[in-house]
Amino acid sequence: MKKILLFLFLILGVYSFSAPSYVDLNKIQRDGYQIDVNDVDTLAFSQEESDMNLVVTMYFTNDGNPQTLRIAFKTMFAPAFGLEYTDEFQTNRAYIQKSFGENRNGIIYGYNIVPKNQKRKGCFLNVFLITEQELPDELLKDIGNTALDEVESYIK
């Protein structure tokens, strides 16, 4: 009996420190993403492809807003990863921030996509694309919409 209670306590403890139940973790993994961080206030998952890498972060807080994420990218995230923030534009759905940097393979381009509106209260998204190609704004707009459609499909 003690072992059963201990087991239940451990299971409940694990669930209390993971993403909210409205996030479909199974679907994320089925779609080929690797879950990198899963705790009470952050879920981060990524997917590496030959031409583009994608990192998605969900923040679970009632204190956030899209402007905070935009500022954090410019002032903290981009510099921390050796990227130089260059420009930003907006679509009807998102803010798209541009950056570039160098790695051992040459120049890389980073595109940070922050939706203007959250699908669910208290859940803020950030989609970061990394590629070796500079992408035109019109293509970034399409990629941004596609990425947001996919990521928002994981939120019930």
Where do the language-model regions lie?
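Sec-dependent N-terminal signal peptides
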Residues: 4-14
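N-terminal "mature-domain start" segment
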Residues: 17-47, 79-88, 146-151
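Signature of long, low-cysteine stretches enriched in small and polar/charged residues
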Residues: 79-119
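Short, surface-exposed coil-to-beta transition loops
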Residues: 38-40, 52-55, 103-112, 122-124
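Localized chelating/binding microdomains
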Residues: 18, 60, 71-73, 149, ...
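Surface-exposed amphipathic alpha-helical segments
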Residues: 33, 127-156
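A short acidic-to-branched-hydrophobic micro-motif
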Residues: 46-75, 123-130
